[in-house]
Amino acid sequence: MEKERINENTIRVMIDNSDLKDRGITVMELLGNHEKIESFFYNILSEVDTEHDFEDDDQVSFQILPNRNGLELFISRLDEENKISDILDNITNFSSKQPANIDNISDKRRQELRQSDKGDIVKSKVSSSDHKDGSQENFENTQVILALSDFENAIAIANSLKIENLVSDLYLYEGAYYLNLLVPDHSVSQEQLKNELAIALEFSRISHVTHEVLHEHGQLILKHEALEKIKSLFS
């Protein structure tokens, strides 16, 4: 296990499969058990925080980025001057697999999309990248938040959905998993979207928890390409 101090508020920990084996756990078992994942996070924190910078009363955020060699864990301390968006920017900068165009588009979408209190599917207009003449093209996106009973359902959805340019985040909130899906309407017909969502709902349900609640209070497990990463690891 290796650690790297990104800044005063964020630690990056590289854990390979042999480290996980020594701890008697696999990536699959870790992501499939919310009690294990929380215990694992804080055990790692206690090992790497040798200078005791992360006090017990600090609010701490974790993000896990699985790969075929193990995983990367980002541990971030939250305070008024260190907002969640800044922490996610730090993580993105260290994620070599994260396409830049997905990051840029998704950040804009997250600023403009809002989920209704009833957990409805939401549409919102978002500007695409600028044209050469300086004009912008607006297109609509569909946001859906799905509640999952367990991690195996996330694997089933990852292996079932066939939507191009899909942005997907996996959250852990109050012991349950949630998928935040952002679908560019220009890349899928309404009929296809309806059919794909029907497949997803075989393994989940539409969530009444809003994206704002997940963003502020949930644990972001996989960012932007959650379904792609899950499929590559567990298909």
Swiss-Prot record:
Identify the InterPro entries for this entry: MecA_C_sf (IPR038471), Neg-reg_MecA (IPR008681)
Region (Disordered), start-end ranges: 113-136
Say what the protein does: Enables the recognition and targeting of unfolded and aggregated proteins to the ClpC protease or to other proteins involved in proteolysis.
HAMAP family listed in its UniProt record: MecA
Which protein family is named in the record?
A: Belongs to the MecA family.
Assembly and interaction partners: Homodimer.
What is the designated name of this protein?
Adapter protein MecA
Species name: Leuconostoc mesenteroides subsp. mesenteroides (strain ATCC 8293 / DSM 20343 / BCRC 11652 / CCM 1803 / JCM 6124 / NCDO 523 / NBRC 100496 / NCIMB 8023 / NCTC 12954 / NRRL B-1118 / 37Y)
The encoding gene is mecA
